[in-house]
Amino acid sequence: MKKFKYVIGVDEAGRGPLAGPVVAVGVMIHLKSQISNLKTTTQNSKLNKMFKELKIKDSKQLSLKRREEIFKLLKKHPRILWAKGMVSAKVIDKINIWEATKLAMKRSIKNLEKKIGKKFPKKKTLLIIDGNLKIDSGFIEQPIIKADQKISECILASIFAKVIRDRLMERYDKIYPKYNFKKHKGYPTKEHKRLITKYGACKIHRRSFKGVGGKRLSG
């Protein structure tokens, strides 16, 4: 495999819900404490050992409590650099969920560049994307099915994105308490669909999604 100066893993949370944003996180793991000497690998033995000890795996296989624990433990780890990108329900309705997912991922990379204070060189940066989606980022892209179970950067991106989105939906629950967003996080559960039918859609519902479109706007 070609050697890259930077390896970034990207994953998203919130592609399937009927409400709320789609959230993407880009993660880069570096072996040096100084960015100027940055060298990245998905085969970092120390981090792999830490992943094993912490029993870190794909966010979908972890409980909410465990995801929160891992996020709190690793969000400020000196070797883990990350940034988020979000796209609102309103924009999702305008451009569709696939384009919104790509946009969220691109925003996460741009925000990661801002965070470290430098641009990633296009030909020396490998972007590993969970799934089979290409996002036209300009970087060398490698979509990998189930990367969120195999690639350290994508595993972390998956966990971080899920935690960030869950927290956001819990905040929305306080603004729109009758929809119980805290429980289902906007996903199309029977309860959520029933509440949409009863109260209509609120401002963070995705009007272009089946089960929401055509429902009166509440509030």
Where are these regions (language model features)?
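RNase H-like, Mg2+-dependent phosphodiesterase core
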Residues: 1-34, 45-219
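Conserved positions within tandem-repeat grammars
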Residues: 36-38
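Ala/Thr-enriched low-complexity intrinsically disordered regions
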Residues: 40-42
